A protein has these predicted regions:
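Charged, terminal alpha-helix-loop-beta segments
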Residues: 1-229
Length: 229
């Protein structure tokens, strides 16, 4: 991001947004730094505005997938070493290790949300289930050197969770209807997102995360084993 922006310019971008379900894809969600007039973090300006306009999230449309959310052909194998698909490969590695400590058993990876080709929806990187607390986790995985803002990660996985037909999802995974569904970013310990949360002033981002019921988890990798810390 070469140029700086005033607070009103950032708010104007938000007010001109046509589709809240694609907000997480907007370039300005990843702006790092401070407004040139009020010296507020760009992410804080955005988070505060979203808190004040929280009802906009109700406009995210649920997509009911006619095919199963659980993809039977997901066998834990991949043939593509393309670095652009590193997060997908990592998700498969986590699937193959079967569990993710406090997040429970890993049920699937790259879980599709689209029903039709033109649907504006991505894929859930990892689905896990902790049977002790009857909670299924929808996890948005980011590779270690990813430099997206935590705000972007939060908005992405929250949008996916709102898009999901939760009743059908639970049925497809043979989970009881009273299973709690929790959406979370899954980022590396000491990553940009982790440092952003522990080192900076993120009052409004944290308030937004509380309202969205989004909690990030931090992951490490040792000897090809992934663990939550």
């Amino acid at each position: 991001m070469a140029k700086g922006y005033k607070k009103d310019e950032i708010i104007n971008k938000l007010e001109n947004l046509k589709d809240i379900s694609t907000l997480y894809k907007e370039d300005f969600i990843n702006y790092r730094g401070y407004t040139i007039d009020t010296k507020e973090k760009y992410t804080e300006v955005i988070a505060e505005w979203l808190i004040k306009n929280f009802n906009l999230f109700d406009n995210i449309k649920k997509i009911t997938r006619q095919s199963s959310y659980k993809v039977d052909t997901h066998d834990g194998k991949h043939n593509n070493q393309n670095s652009n698909r590193l997060e997908e490969i990592m998700a498969i590695e986590i699937f193959n290790q079967k569990s993710l400590n406090i997040l429970g058993k890993v049920l699937d990876y790259q879980t599709p949300l689209k029903n039709e080709r033109d649907d504006k929806a991505g894929k859930i990187d990892i689905v896990s289930y902790n049977k002790d607390i009857k909670t299924v986790y929808l996890l948005e995985l980011k590779k270690e050197d990813n430099e997206e803002t935590m705000l972007r990660c939060v908005l992405e996985i929250f949008t996916y969770s709102k898009t999901l037909d939760k009743d059908k999802f639970l049925e497809d995974f043979n989970l009881s209807k009273d299973t709690k569904i929790k959406a979370s970013p899954l980022v590396f310990f000491n990553s940009f997102q982790h440092k952003e949360m522990v080192e900076g002033d993120n009052k409004f981002l944290k308030q937004l995360m509380d309202k969205l019921d989004i909690e990030p988890f931090y992951i490490t990798k040792n000897s090809n084993y992934y663990a939550i810390i």
